């Protein structure tokens, strides 16, 4: 068994320092303000996926795999909110955001590559970040604030996206 000197909590990293190092490692011009809408998830041991919205309003992604960060990649879009991300099985994750049209859009990673943006509809308030959760393989829940100020919910039941329901 390792001694307590050999085992300890992972080192703490300031998020703004991490994002600065990720963005600066890219060949693009550094953003004029801190990235917004930070979200993170993990879908397996030794892996951490980080998402943010940059000055270009596109969604950006970088992954830490076995302690090393990948180069940031643009996932596109013109986000009007921060991202919400959830892993729902090993090697699978989904990211959500509200776009300028007031609809919820998503992209998902299937373990091989990113699928294109897909609209999940809705009449949502722009600028308000949705929330996402998963309580099992093939089950996703996403929550967002509607233009009516109420909370709306939509979920993936393993075969399809169930229509929006108003929660209150």
Residue ranges, per PLM feature:
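A structural motif
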Residues: 2-168
């Amino acid at each position: 068994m390792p001694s307590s000197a050999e085992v300890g909590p992972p080192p703490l990293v300031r998020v703004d320092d991490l994002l600065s190092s990720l963005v600066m490692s890219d060949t693009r011009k550094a953003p004029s303000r801190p990235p917004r809408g930070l979200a993170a998830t993990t879908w397996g041991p030794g892996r951490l996926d980080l998402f943010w919205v940059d000055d270009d309003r596109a969604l950006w992604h970088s992954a830490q795999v076995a302690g090393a960060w990948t180069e940031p990649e643009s996932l596109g879009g013109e986000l009007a909110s921060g991202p919400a991300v959830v892993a729902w099985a090993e090697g699978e994750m989904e990211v959500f955001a509200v776009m300028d049209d007031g609809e919820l859009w998503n992209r998902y990673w299937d373990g091989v590559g990113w699928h294109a943006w897909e609209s999940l509809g809705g009449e949502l308030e722009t600028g308000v970040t949705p929330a996402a959760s998963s309580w099992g393989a093939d089950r996703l829940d996403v929550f967002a604030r509607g233009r009516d100020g109420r909370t709306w919910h939509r979920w993936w039941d393993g075969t399809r996206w169930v229509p929006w329901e108003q929660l209150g």
